[in-house]
């Protein structure tokens, strides 16, 4: 599965599935390591997306283009 094709929500869902499989399926060491590596890549991807989104929000707020409360 190509992690770059997954959006943030699908990546989180996949991470939940990986954690569940490691906790409940009792995989052998090689399978557990592969799942761990896949999860680490998904985490990296999610963090990058969160940081990118945070920067966009900061730009919007600092530009004054957004009013949070209109009276």
Swiss-Prot record:
The keyword Glycoprotein does not apply. Signal peptide: none annotated. The keyword Translocase does not apply. Gene3D superfamilies: Exonuclease VII, small subunit. GO terms for biological process: DNA catabolic process. InterPro entries: Exonuc_VII_S, Exonuc_VII_ssu_sf. Coiled coil: none annotated. It catalyses: Exonucleolytic cleavage in either 5'- to 3'- or 3'- to 5'-direction to yield nucleoside 5'-phosphates. Its main location: cytoplasm. One of its GO terms (molecular function) is exodeoxyribonuclease VII activity. Disulfide bonds: none annotated. Pfam families: Exonuc_VII_S (PF02609). GO terms for cellular component: cytosol; exodeoxyribonuclease VII complex. It is found in: Cytoplasm. Its EC number is 3.1.11.6. Keywords: Cytoplasm, Exonuclease, Hydrolase, Nuclease. PANTHER family: EXODEOXYRIBONUCLEASE 7 SMALL SUBUNIT (PTHR34137:SF1). Heterooligomer composed of large and small subunits. HAMAP family: Exonuc_7_S. Belongs to the XseB family. Bidirectionally degrades single-stranded DNA into large acid-insoluble oligonucleotides, which are then degraded further into small acid-soluble oligonucleotides. This is Exodeoxyribonuclease 7 small subunit. It comes from Endomicrobium trichonymphae.
């Amino acid at each position: 599965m190509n992690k770059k094709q997954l959006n943030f929500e699908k990546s989180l869902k996949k991470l939940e599935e990986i954690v569940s499989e490691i906790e409940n399926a009792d995989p052998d060491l090689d399978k557990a390591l592969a799942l761990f590596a896949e999860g680490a890549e998904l985490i990296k991807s999610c963090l990058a997306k969160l940081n990118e989104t945070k920067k966009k929000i900061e730009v919007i707020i600092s530009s004054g283009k957004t009013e949070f409360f209109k009276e």
